[in-house]
Design a protein with these regions (language model features):
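Conserved, well-structured interaction surfaces
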Residues: 90-168, 202-212, 220-233, 435-442, ...
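Inward-facing hydrophobic residues that define packing positions of alpha-helical scaffold repeats
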Residues: 122-125, 213, 220, 290, ...
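Extended amphipathic alpha-helical segments enriched in small hydrophobics
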Residues: 155, 247-248, 444-474
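Hydrophobic-face positions in mid-chain alpha helices that act as interaction patches
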Residues: 268-447, 482-483, 496, 506, ...
């Protein structure tokens, strides 16, 4: 058998031994971890401390395992989220180290690495907040910008955790019944703050959603206050526009939840005056949340300097999706050889850049990430994004067909499979030297995402007709060459379908549409006529429910150290390929 079995099994064995829990967060110090007792409260030291946050985005092997195929920083989390959706098949799975995650048969260990990574990242943020507060309280006004980074990053991480780990109904009766028995509904993950006493980590229950939302919003409010007047030097730091984007994400998450459940809305309202020190939300309806989402999206969109990617920027063989530009609101920053891992199969571009001679996208491995046929077929002929993936009629050609922006030779092109992605380019466009090609950044939030959030929000506040017209104008202005795109939606369901097509095309590979699938209870459909998913991965989840594999589970080892948590049902094998 090929190497994926060996690597997956070894990674699983390592995961079995993880102390990847909030109790052990006090005991574990991975590399790039900032430790408060080691850093003085002066501006230079605070800057160093705050730098640990963007640094941890691209830190790999945080657990310290020999095999870390599922432990290569935040880009790894992005990659995993997309492979759990419907648009991310691999051309050949012989070297697919994620095969048992992607086919849904063995999911728990991949979740464990996510849990461990996020909580160690949160420890970094807590350290920044702890020392930042000390400095600000001591009169150091410059420290506010670093304190704002701590609050902003912590809010982003907890918002991810909530949306990953909260159990939502799947339509699989056995799983959903088990979730009821366990008490999984309506609870999220444990909250660990900079002030949480060590002893509390060993009896730290999962926070209910109505507490978690207010906790995250409080962090965002504090970040917004701290970052007033701040101008950042790099886009791996947050400024107020990013905080507005995060608030947009959070308000839209709440809006969808409360629209679906009046009971959950009532619980949120009842928790408004809880004595926990968190800010009030000040809402009484899902409509209030949609209005807030639209408000903060507008604030983000109005921030100076942003514009949607142009065709030239998107498809640039040298800088496409590897270099920050005026579309990026937040991104990783990799600008030196010291930051890269030369084992390319433990890197994002090692899996995602098809043009290289050094990654998994070569004839040696044939592990090309492709777009799902169903989505590709929905991209209009006059949508210039269509050339981000190889048309089946152009695959195998001995010369590069017209319409594609690439520097590869005809010989290399002839090896690329149908639907193969060309979206993510190697650093500096270098296809031959991985020590150059891996020096590349990635977007974590783009202005286009927030624009789509705005369209969804106004569909609920201004009506479907207004939102459909706005979406149509935006797509024709920014993505079509001839203005031929039409959005004829007259119902909310039809509009969401149209908007999701645009989200899935625009944000392919960026690890974001997972959250929309889960938020909106959308089915993942991989089995259909002509599908390019391997037979074992042709999983179809149930309409109106969350795909089981999108409910991450807290590690059982967390409960060993922190018995107050609720470990949800294991979704492995809940739905299988037919």
């Amino acid at each position: 058998m090929k190497r994926y079995i060996k690597n997956t099994l070894l990674a699983s064995v390592a995961a079995l031994t993880l102390c990847c829990n909030t109790a052990c967060i006090d005991e574990t110090t991975p590399k790039d971890m900032a430790v408060p007792g080691q850093i003085a409260s002066n501006s230079k030291s605070l800057q160093y401390l705050a730098n640990s946050l963007p640094s941890f985005l691209v830190t790999w092997n945080t657990y310290g395992s020999t095999y870390y195929t599922q432990d290569w920083g935040y880009p790894c989390q992005m990659y995993m989220r997309d492979l759990l959706c419907a648009d991310f098949p691999m051309s050949d799975n012989g070297y697919n180290y994620w095969i048992y995650t992607e086919d849904g048969s063995s999911l728990r260990y991949a979740y464990y690495y996510s849990y461990f990574y996020y909580y160690n990242f949160i420890k970094n943020a807590n350290n920044v907040i702890s020392i930042g507060n000390q400095a600000v309280n001591g009169g150091n006004e410059v420290a506010k910008q670093y304190l704002g980074q701590g609050y902003g990053y912590r809010a982003m991480l907890y918002l991810d955790l909530v949306r990953l780990f909260e159990y939502k109904k799947t339509g699989v009766k056995a799983l959903d019944d088990e979730a009821t028995t366990l008490g999984s509904y309506g609870v999220t993950v444990p909250i660990v703050k900079e002030t949480t006493p060590t002893q509390d980590l060993y009896n730290n229950p999962c926070a209910p959603f109505y507490t978690m939302y207010r906790f995250i919003m409080t962090d965002l409010n504090r970040a917004e206050e701290c970052l007033a007047g701040y101008t950042r030097s790099i886009k791996a730091y947050m400024d107020r526009s990013v905080i507005y984007g995060l608030k947009t994400r959070l308000w839209l998450e709440m809006a969808s939840r409360f629209e679906q459940s009046a009971a959950y809305l009532q619980k949120q309202i009842e928790a408004e005056n809880a004595d926990d020190g968190y800010d009030k939300l000040g809402i009484n309806s899902a409509a209030d949340c949609y209005a807030k989402a639209a408000h903060y999206a507008q604030k983000a969109l109005a921030s100076d300097g942003y514009h949607p990617l142009t065709e030239a920027e998107w498809s640039d063989p040298t800088t496409g999706f590897n270099t920050a530009n005026d579309s990026w609101m937040l991104g990783t920053l990799v600008n030196s050889k010291e930051q890269i891992n030369e084992l390319s199969w433990y890197t994002f571009l090692g899996w995602m850049s098809a043009e290289t001679e050094w990654g998994m996208g070569t004839t040696k491995y044939n592990a090309y990430r492709c777009i799902g046929k169903a989505l590709y077929d929905k991209i209009g002929d006059n949508d210039w994004r269509r050339a981000s993936w190889i048309n089946p009629n152009d695959a195998g050609a001995s010369t590069v067909p017209s319409g594609y922006k690439t520097n590869v030779s005809g010989e290399k092109w002839s090896t690329l499979p149908a639907y193969c992605n060309l979206k993510f380019r190697p650093g500096s466009g270098n296809t031959t030297d991985l020590t150059v090609g891996l020096i590349a950044s990635l977007p974590l939030m783009r202005i286009e995402e927030i624009q789509f959030d705005y369209f969804e929000a106004i569909a609920h506040t201004q009506g479907v007709a207004a939102a459909a017209a706005a979406l149509q104008e935006w797509v024709n202005t920014n993505r079509y060459t001839d203005g031929s795109y039409t959005c004829n939606a007259t119902t909310m369901d039809d509009f969401i379908d149209a908007l999701m097509i645009q989200r899935r095309v625009e944000l392919w590979g960026e690890g974001l549409v997972f959250f929309d699938y889960k938020r909106l209870n959308l089915p993942v459909t991989r089995k259909y006529s002509g599908t390019n998913y391997a037979s074992s991965m042709q999983l179809n989840s149930y309409d109106g429910y969350v795909a089981p594999w999108m409910n991450y589970m807290i590690p059982e080892t967390e409960k060993d150290h922190n018995p107050a948590v609720i470990v949800g049902p294991n979704p492995s094998g809940a739905i299988t390929a037919e």
